UniProtKB/Swiss-Prot annotation:
Posttranslational mods: Capsid protein p24 is phosphorylated. Specific enzymatic cleavages by the viral protease yield mature proteins. The polyprotein is cleaved during and after budding, this process is termed maturation.
UniProt keyword annotations, A-Z: Capsid protein, Host cell membrane, Host cytoplasm, Host membrane, Host nucleus, Host-virus interaction, Lipoprotein, Membrane, Metal-binding, Myristate, Phosphoprotein, Repeat, RNA-binding, Viral budding, Viral budding via the host ESCRT complexes, Viral nucleoprotein, Viral release from host cell, Virion, Zinc, Zinc-finger
Other known facts: This is an African mandrill isolate.
Protein name: Gag polyprotein
One Gene Ontology MF term: zinc ion binding
Compositionally biased intervals (Basic and acidic residues): 481-492
Gene3D superfamilies linked to this entry: 1.10.1200.30, Human Immunodeficiency Virus Type 1 Capsid Protein, Immunodeficiency lentiviruses, gag gene matrix protein p17, Single helix bin, Zinc finger, CCHC-type
GO cellular component: host cell cytoplasm; host cell nucleus; host cell plasma membrane; membrane; viral nucleocapsid
Length: 502
C-alpha cells in the first residue's frame, strides 16, 4: 500500500511522523502504522477511506470507543491511531497518543452534555430561529412516577415537578399528570383546582367575539391553557408570539403547583403548632421535623419568618429553650444549632451540674463574707458527759471501750435477761427527748418560764355562732332524754314477762 493510498498527505503526514507513540518515549508514528490501521478496520467491517476525513474518523470512534475500556491491546492501539489522525484533520496540536485521547474525550463529553440539555427542554430554537417541539423524555416521566410512588405527596414532590417540567407546554404537563396510575383521589382534587383557576381566567380574560380578523390567533381560554381544547401548534404559537406572548405552559404549571400545595397540606395532618421537641430528642432532628412541616404550610414569607422566630423556640424542650432565649431575638439558625449541640447528653448534664455547684459554692462564700467573723467567745456545751453501759463510767461510750464486753443485764447484773427486759427500775436517770445539749439537764432557754397572759381583748362572738352553739346544746339534751326514755320502756317491758312472787 503506497503513499498514494495513504490517509494523510504532504504536511499532514509530516505532522503525523513527529507525534510520539508514548508520552516521553523516543519512537514516533510512521507510514506503516497507517497501513496497519487500515488492515484492522477491515476486521471491523469498516472502510479504510473513513480515515481520510474528520467525519470518517468520528464514525470509526463511535463504533470502537464504547469498547475501549474492555478491549484488547490491538483495539486500544487502533483507537489511539484514529484519534491522532482525527486531531491532525481538525488542526489540534498534540505531541503523543495520550494527548489525542484526552482532547477527543473532552470534545465527546461536551457534545453529550449538549444533547442531554436539548432533551430536557421540549421547546428548542433551531439555526433558522424557528421554534421546534420535542416530546418529553420517557426518562423524565419514569422519574416523576417513581417519585410519586415513593414520596406520596410530601413537600419535596413540588420542587421536583417544577424542575422536571422546566420549559414544558400544557401538552407535556398533561402527559405527566396522566402517567400517575394510583392516587386518583388526589388527581381529582388537582382537577378541581385547575377547573377553578380556568374559570377565574375566563372571567378576567374574556375572549374576543368575533375572532381576530385575518385569521389571527384567538385569545386562549382557560381550557386552552389546560390543553383540553388547544393543539400543540397553538400552544407553541401563543408562547412565541412577537407581541403580547402568553406562556400557557407556565400559567398551567402554576395552577398545577397550587393544587399540589393543597394536596401536600391535606396529606400532612400535623399542624406547625403541634411540632414539639421531645425531652431526649436532639435539637437538629427537631429542626428538621419543624421545617418539613412548615414547607407544607400555605403561608406568606412574613408568617413563616414569624414561625421560625417564635414557634421554633417556644416548642423546644426546657433545656434548649433556656439556651435559645439567652441568645436573643436576632440569633440565626446556625447559631441555634451550634448552641444546642449536645443538649441532653452526658457531657451537657455534667456541665450543668458543675455550673450549679460553682454557683452554690459562690453564694455560700458571699454569705460568709457578708456575715463577717463571729463576735464574742465560742460557747461550749455544758451538758453531762455520755455514760458507758459496759463500765458505768462517764466520758466515753461502750462502742469505744477497750475492756471485754460485760455479759448479762447492764442494769441489775442478772445473766438471764438483757437490760431492755429488766423488771427493775433504771438506776440512772434517763435522758430527756431533747438529748444532751448546752442547756444541761434542765429545760432549754427557749421554753417559757410561766404562761403569758394575752393582753389583747377577746374576740367578739358572732350572732350566728352563738345561735349555732345554743342549738347544739339543745340537741345534745334531746338526745340524752331520748336515751333515758328508751331505757325506761325496756325496763317496763321486761317486768311484764315475769309474774309477781306469791
Amino acid at each position: 500500500m503506497g503513499n498514494g493510498n495513504s490517509a494523510l498527505l504532504g504536511t499532514d503526514l509530516d505532522k503525523f511522523e513527529k507525534i510520539r507513540l508514548k508520552r516521553g518515549g523516543k519512537k514516533c508514528y510512521r507510514l506503516k502504522h497507517l497501513c496497519w490501521c487500515k488492515g484492522e478496520l477491515d476486521r471491523f467491517g469498516l472502510s479504510d477511506k473513513l480515515l481520510e476525513t474528520q467525519q470518517g474518523c468520528e464514525k470509526i470512534l463511535s463504533v470502537c470507543w464504547p469498547l475501549y475500556d474492555q478491549g484488547s491491546d490491538n483495539l486500544k492501539a487502533l483507537v489511539g491511531t484514529v484519534c491522532v489522525v482525527a486531531c491532525i484533520h481538525a488542526g489540534i496540536e498534540i505531541k503523543s497518543t495520550q494527548d489525542a485521547l484526552k482532547k477527543l474525550k473532552v470534545i465527546t463529553r461536551k457534545e453529550e452534555k449538549q444533547e442531554d440539555e436539548s432533551k430536557n427542554f421540549p421547546v428548542q430554537r433551531d439555526a433558522a430561529g424557528q421554534y421546534q417541539y420535542t416530546p418529553i423524555s420517557p426518562r423524565i416521566i419514569q422519574t416523576w412516577v417513581k417519585t410519586v410512588e415513593e414520596k406520596k405527596w410530601k413537600p419535596e414532590v413540588i420542587p421536583l415537578f417544577s424542575a422536571l417540567t422546566e420549559g414544558a407546554i400544557s401538552h407535556d404537563l398533561n402527559i405527566m399528570l396522566n402517567a400517575v396510575g394510583d392516587h386518583q383521589g388526589a388527581m381529582q382534587v388537582l382537577k378541581d383546582v385547575i377547573n377553578e383557576q380556568a374559570a377565574e381566567w375566563d372571567l378576567t380574560h374574556p375572549q374576543q367575539q368575533p375572532a381576530q380578523p385575518g385569521g389571527g390567533l384567538r385569545t386562549p381560554s382557560g381550557s386552552d391553557i389546560a390543553g383540553t381544547t388547544s393543539t400543540v401548534e397553538e400552544q407553541l404559537a401563543w408562547m412565541n408570539m412577537q407581541q403580547n406572548a402568553i406562556n400557557v405552559g407556565t400559567i398551567y404549571k402554576s395552577w398545577i403547583i397550587l393544587g399540589m400545595n393543597r394536596l401536600v397540606k391535606s396529606h400532612c395532618p400535623i399542624s406547625i403548632t403541634d411540632v414539639r421537641q421531645g425531652p431526649k430528642e436532639a435539637f437538629k432532628d427537631y429542626v428538621d421535623r419543624f421545617y418539613n412541616v412548615m414547607r407544607a404550610e400555605q403561608a406568606s414569607g412574613e408568617v413563616k419568618m414569624w414561625m421560625q422566630q417564635h414557634l421554633l423556640i417556644e416548642n423546644a424542650n426546657p433545656e434548649c429553650k433556656q439556651i435559645l432565649r439567652s441568645l436573643g431575638k436576632g440569633a440565626t439558625l446556625e447559631e441555634m444549632l451550634e448552641a444546642c449541640q449536645g443538649v441532653g447528653g452526658p457531657q451537657h448534664k455534667a456541665r450543668l451540674m458543675a455550673e450549679m455547684m460553682r454557683t452554690v459554692v459562690g453564694q455560700s462564700q458571699n454569705f460568709v463574707q457578708q456575715r463577717g467573723p463571729q463576735r464574742g467567745p465560742v460557747r461550749q456545751p455544758t451538758g453531762r458527759k455520755p455514760i458507758c453501759f459496759n463500765c458505768n463510767k462517764e466520758g466515753h461510750v461502750a462502742r469505744f471501750f477497750k475492756a471485754p464486753r460485760r455479759k448479762g443485764c447492764w442494769n441489775c447484773g442478772a445473766m438471764d435477761h438483757q437490760k431492755a427486759q429488766c423488771p427493775k427500775p433504771a438506776q440512772q436517770q434517763r435522758v430527756n427527748f431533747l438529748g444532751y445539749g448546752p442547756w444541761g439537764p434542765s429545760k432549754p432557754g427557749n421554753y417559757p418560764a410561766q404562761e403569758v397572759t394575752p393582753t389583747a381583748p377577746p374576740l367578739e362572738e358572732k350572732p350566728l355562732q352563738k345561735t349555732l352553739s345554743t342549738y347544739q346544746k339543745l340537741g345534745r339534751g334531746l338526745r340524752q332524754k331520748m336515751k333515758e326514755e328508751k331505757r325506761e320502756e325496756d325496763f317496763h317491758s321486761l317486768s311484764t314477762l315475769f309474774q309477781e312472787d306469791q
